Amino acid sequence: MNAATSITQAPVADVELKQLNEATAQRESATNNPNDSSSIDERPIHSALSESQRSALLAVASFAAAISPASTTTYYPAITTLARDLDVSITQINLSISVYQIFQGLAPTVAAALSDRYGRRPVYLGCLFINIAANLGLARQENYTSLMVLRCLQSSSSSGTVALGQAVMDDLVTSEERGKYMAYLTLGLVMGPALGPLIGGLLSQYLGWRAIFWFLMILGGFFFVLTFTFFRETNRSIVGDGSVPPPKWNRSLVQILRKDKLVPNRESLQKKRIGVNPLASVQILCNKENFIVCMYGALLFGGYASVISIFATQLEERYGYSQVQVGLCYLPFGVGSILSRWTAGKMIDWNFKREAEKQGLKIVKNRQQDLSQYDIEKARLTISFPMIFATCGFVVAYGWLMQYNTHVASVLVIVFLIANVFTGVLIANSALLNDLNPGNGAALGAAMNLTRCLMGAGGVAAVTPLINKIGIGYTATATAGVWLAVLPALYVVYSKGYTWRKAALRSSAQGRGEGSRVASPSP
């Protein structure tokens, strides 16, 4: 009110008044027509960094995130050796995998909250430092209790990097490119399961299982140096669109040695969050649309994790393979996942643009579109459904091929296909959740990690007893059956999600209107 009064009372030159009216008209046009081409072109760029800089940052985030799954899968080829050396059962070693995944789900909630408050970079460095210490302890431990405790610490430190990767992507990437960049981010998550067993098999067979943890310690040290040297802060409340310099203590070594040429755009800074809220990820899950999409993705992930975890022991028991041979057989998982960048990733971005054209949403490169009036659920899930059906079919085929001890080549082809289509579902699922929760990448990453890892822990713990009871063929069939039985819940999001969001926006707008009337002083 005071600003309006001062503008009215002050003598304003004709030119200034004309400029003010034009600016007001532009703002009203952008508000009333968020998808109008002129209003979109007026929006600020989302990131001042070049495409190569963004790709490099996401590559570092992706490789850092690979530590978490790599710490799980390098372990698989040594399961039998560990059980023998520590004088425990294979079931107890599998329990250590389940406990690892539980902490893998819980710990990122804290890492996400800290990164929202203090920045992505310092939390990355803290997680990597603790991970180095945990692997040092694991390499020197002598009993099962120490193994369990240190695996929990290892899991807590490494898993934070997964949630941070989602946050970095949200800081840097708009919705139209999310499929491509999500594939880059997913690359680290799938390279761990792909290369981990091979590396673990080689190390455990020729140097012993302790060499696995020495390797992980060295890997963590390498990523610590890489992050310290090259990784720049991306938190938009600290650096805005990337052009605002962070505090000196939060600059990469490259930034310290070489001054940025970017012109600081302080208007791009987002409001800084006060305090640390580790429950932010839980609050995201309180939204019914987020909950359904997250839980279905977690259900898929749980089944996929169980497929990966039993693959090593099945190859050893059914085909008599050595640890190195087992590790090599995991490569199709990685190759299939990597290729999803060019299959599923491109399809997801193509379908986003196709739906945008149908719905009248104009796409402008490096401008974040207003998705409140866009049926984003249709754009993302149209691609997901056929890939989910394909994943179910391939998992059933995998189970029965294993059951009848068919030639290993057929099994490897199937696991390649499983990895390719499953990664595509994962990309679409993550892209939709990022679209539904803009500006909450860290908390969202923690929420996805929480649901996926808890479901994965349950799947890994249950799969071996289930196979022992009914066989791997029926176990795989039951897994696909559960996925299909719950699929209608995801279809509800496809058909009703946009309606839910519009209703929530109307309710929120009405609430703000009522609040402003109540808060206004009486004349």
Curated annotation (Swiss-Prot):
The chain crosses the membrane at residues 183-203, 211-231, 291-311, 319-339, 381-401, 408-428, 443-463, 470-490. InterPro entries: MFS, MFS_dom, MFS_trans_sf, Sugar_transporter_CS. One of its GO terms (molecular function) is transmembrane transporter activity. Gene3D superfamilies: MFS general substrate transporter like domains. One of its GO terms (cellular component) is plasma membrane. It is found in: Membrane. Keywords: Glycoprotein, Membrane, Transmembrane, Transmembrane helix, Transport. It is a multi-pass membrane protein. Glycans are attached at residues 35, 94, 143, 235, 250. GO terms for biological process: export across plasma membrane; xenobiotic transport. Pfam families: MFS_1 (PF07690). Belongs to the major facilitator superfamily. PANTHER family: MAJOR FACILITATOR SUPERFAMILY, QUINIDINE RESISTANCE PROTEIN 1-RELATED. MFS-type transporter; part of the gene cluster that mediates the biosynthesis of squalestatin S1 (SQS1, also known as zaragozic acid A), a heavily oxidized fungal polyketide that offers potent cholesterol lowering activity by targeting squalene synthase (SS). This is MFS-type transporter R5. The lineage of its organism: Eukaryota, Fungi, Dikarya, Ascomycota, Pezizomycotina. The gene is R5.
